[in-house]
Amino acid sequence: MDPLGDHPLCCNKSGDRITRHNRLRNLVFKLADTGLLAPELEKLGILGVTDKTRRRPGDVSIKSWSFRRGLAIDVAVIHPLAASHLGKAEPCESYAQTQKIDRYAAAFVHSDYDFAPVIFETSGALNKEGETVLKQQVASGTQTASETEKFNENKVTK
């Protein structure tokens, strides 16, 4: 163990980083699935038929997010005390902009999907756009649960 105890949180050489990413990606997927949003994991071809790079910038994609538009959610986990984030007031926002939006947003212009980076910090913080997307997913799940409850109540009373 290192003297500060943060090595496991920020080391790029261990499988912990990938495991942490996959667990949070699966959580985002489960939220969308609970809300009956029909999510897909790492959908290939999300950037359209003209994109030959075979990139999959959407860890979780939702085909029917808004009117005639889907949503590609790209999940990332960062450690705010890593050297690349020190001195940044909002590491999640900075990472979302430089590593996700700047890299992928232009590719979505001719796609049927919008793009939303959901960036978690190992300390628990979340970028603003990610928070908005997750709140919308929770609201969808809550609405779905409420409708199911009403349906079950009607079934019992008849």
Region annotations inferred by a language model:
Residues 15, 87-95:
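Short, contiguous acidic/charged loop-to-helix segments that flank catalytic cores in large enzymes
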Residues 19, 23-27, 99, 129:
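Generic recognition of stable, solvent-exposed alpha-helical segments in well-folded globular domains
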